[in-house]
Amino acid sequence: MNYPLEIHPAGQAPCTVCEPGWLISLCADVRMRHYWDGLPRINLAAGQAWCTGAESDTVCWVETGLLATVFADAQGRERVHHFHSAAHWLTPPFGLPAQDWRIEAQVPSRLLVMNDLQLEEAKVLDKRVHDWMLQALMAERQRLIQREHQWLMFSAAERYLKVLQEAPGWLELVPQHRLASYLGVTDVALSRIRRRLKTGH
């Protein structure tokens, strides 16, 4: 069964709804195990990008690795919407057409890809799975909305310290320009923040 037990090597806590023991127990049912193992998966090398194209209803489950959702802002500059480590759902950024954003692997990664039709197939097999998946997706969306609101109230240095506290593994895996984009600063500003925190000046 393709379910990672080593679920958050990048330091970020796993999805609070997606307890691995629960899914493993549920997939003890042969039909559900075949369903889950039969869902399409995509392997991405570090730096490789993947676009959902016209499939706006696509959602992904990150099995291994660390991914970023990347989009272009109104000025055409690339921005990182969020990072997604293993054992997290990855959903489209709100308000963006499917063709306007992409998924980019920060390290070698594997993601499971699912659309509305496949979610409905889960409902036919076991309504609990369908309800659980929807609950997990809503929880992930809410988490990202809360983070966006929180980011607006934080200074760039406070955002960096938040990442350092919650997901220190990102700092070794994510290229500086991607981390700077996520924090809403330039590469130079991020270097200054790091130097100031290191030296105290």
Please place each PLM-identified region on the residue numbering.
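Conserved short histidine dyad/triad with adjacent acidic residue
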Residues: 40-55, 74-76, 84-87
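Cyclic-nucleotide recognition modules
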Residues: 80-135
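Glycine- and acidic-residue-biased ligand/ion/polar-headgroup-sensing regions
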Residues: 57-70, 86-87
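Phosphate-/nucleic-acid-contacting segments
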Residues: 154-201
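Cyclic nucleotide-binding regulatory module and flanking cytosolic helices
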Residues: 1-46
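A cytosolic small-molecule/anion-sensing beta-strand core signal
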Residues: 45, 63-64, 85, 107
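Short beta-strand segments in beta-sandwich/barrel cores
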Residues: 49, 66-71, 110-111
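Short, Lys/Arg-enriched N-terminal segment that forms or immediately precedes the first helix
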Residues: 89, 139-150
